[in-house]
Amino acid sequence: MTTEITRPTAVFPDLEGKIVLVTGAGRGIGRAIAEEFAKQKSNLMLVDLDPRVEQTAAEIASAHGTKVDFRLASVTDSARVKEVVEETVAPYDNTLHVLVNNAGITRDGIAMRMSDDDWNAVISTNLTGTHNLCKASIRYLRKAKGAVVNISSISGVVGNVGQTNYCAAKGGVIAYTKALAAEYQGVRFTAICPGFINTDMTARLPSDIAKYVVARTKVKRVGEPWEIAQAVVRSAAEFGNTYAPCAIVLVAGGMELGG
């Protein structure tokens, strides 16, 4: 399912020492994002509901020699989110430079057969969770003239059969990102839209479905988590670019163009 590709080196000196909070950071794309920031010597707070985030934080800190803390939290719990954000910024004079909203889930099913629980869970985690973090963080980000990077999905752009809840949530993230940029000057907002990425989640898909999705890309391969991570870090590194307050970035192998 993978094709050998050359991984470029991404170096952004302006991110050294910056305070970065990443949700859904225990594994997959979230872990790759955290590792990429650690390479830039940023100070990290990793947030996840999965207890494995503790081991992830320890491994990244050991590998890259930077400060990596973690918290167990559900992004759907607004009170807990507020606590985590306050604990993140307290040691740094109430400053937050970068927020990455990566936490997300899928619960697939045909629209008219989808349970209320499956619909609500996906909207709550993927869209409301993003709002909860932004709401709790915005005043600290404005102080730092920082950056918000929201992880959306190509599914929020082109739609996908069996994922009406996920598509609605991720499409909502794109619109939410644009609206926040209109409301708040001094913070740069980006929505990154990954395509079919090589993670443990996609590895569980039946091979015929995986082949179908790959065939829809222009590059005829899956993406790697580091490709999303480098797009995130690149977007965050431009937080001082006041002439680009908002960007929607598709990192999907050309899926939006048709196979």
Regions found by a protein language model. Give the residues of each.
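Short C-terminal tail/terminal secondary-structure segment
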Residues: 2-11, 158, 240, 245-259
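Active-site helix of classical SDR
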Residues: 134, 169, 177
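Alpha-helical segment proximal to the catalytic Tyr-Lys
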Residues: 139, 181-185
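C-terminal substrate-recognition "lid" of short-chain dehydrogenase/reductases
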Residues: 140-142, 221-251, 256
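Substrate-binding pocket helix/loop in short-chain dehydrogenase/reductase
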Residues: 110-111, 115-120, 202, 213
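Short, small/polar-rich loop/turn modules that mediate ligand/substrate recognition or access, typified
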Residues: 185-188, 193, 243-246
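Residue(s) in the substrate-gating loop at a strand-loop-helix junction
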Residues: 153
